[in-house]
Amino acid sequence: MASTQCFLHHQYAITTPTRTLSQRQVVTTKPNHIVCKAQKQDDVVDAVVSRRLALSVLIGAAAVGSKVSPADAAYGEAANVFGKAKTNTDYLPYNGDGFKLLVPAKWNPSKEREFPGQVLRYEDNFDATSNVSVLVQTTDKKSITDYGSPEEFLSKVDYLLGKQAFFGQTDSEGGFDTNAVAVANILESSAPVIGGKQYYNISVLTRTADGDEGGKHQLITATVKDGKLYICKAQAGDKRWFKGARKFVEDTASSFSVA
């Protein structure tokens, strides 16, 4: 814009030569003044652009030279402001006599003993149906496979699933057999070898006629070592199982191992 204005003023001065010297001086003074302003504006623009370029270079250099800080956190995660390695606070390690496992941090120890040889029980603060128990019993078996298949082993320790308390004439709704008020279904079983030791993993869904919790999901992990049968049973009610308890029960059961 500044150069265009100067061109118009110069043309006007040339086409009016009959004006006085003072008038020509005035005319020639204005374009000079305009040019001067235009130069100042250009200088300001150049200075602003230069500063922006310099700032961009600094930001780019900082981005290239920076490293991801331990305090950085993705969306939805808590920032580790002190820069130390984060640990899993959802579980607490438990080292027992000959075994170890991870216990949900919000579960409390319980003195209740349901089964023979039970040495540990932790339960959910808000729902005792969600719990984990560890049993240690003497045995003449050398390996867990000496009990037969996982299903055969379960039949020998079916007390873990809870005995039917009612015996009499009844026809319960919900698909139960005549005179039966409880049923257990094996959902899955496996026989992994961990650390050179054979284990049995059995997932069972038990239901009772009273419909309490819609049934219980019970995960049983067992192995034999040095003349002892080690059993870990973690469970949760069916409703809470699908509301988040499943993760804690599965993680606890899978963490169990003999030392």
UniProtKB/Swiss-Prot annotation:
Subcellular localization: Plastid, Chloroplast thylakoid membrane
Gene Ontology MF terms in the entry: calcium ion binding
High-level lineage: Eukaryota, Viridiplantae, Streptophyta, Embryophyta, Tracheophyta
Organism (species): Pisum sativum (Garden pea)
CC annotations in GO: chloroplast thylakoid membrane; extrinsic component of membrane; photosystem II oxygen evolving complex
Entry's induction text: By light.
Gene3D superfamilies: Mog1/PsbP, alpha/beta/alpha sandwich
Pfam short name (any one): PsbP
Residue stretch of the organelle transit peptide: 1-73
Function summary: May be involved in the regulation of photosystem II.
Transmembrane regions: none
Family: Belongs to the PsbP family.
Family matches, as SUPFAM superfamilies: Mog1p/PsbP-like (SSF55724)
Record's keyword terms, sorted: Chloroplast, Membrane, Photosynthesis, Photosystem II, Plastid, Thylakoid, Transit peptide
A Gene Ontology biological process term: photosynthesis
Protein name, entry field: Oxygen-evolving enhancer protein 2, chloroplastic
Keyword field contains Transport: no
UniProt KW Transmembrane keyword: no
UniProt xrefs under InterPro entries: Mog1/PsbP_a/b/a-sand, PsbP_C
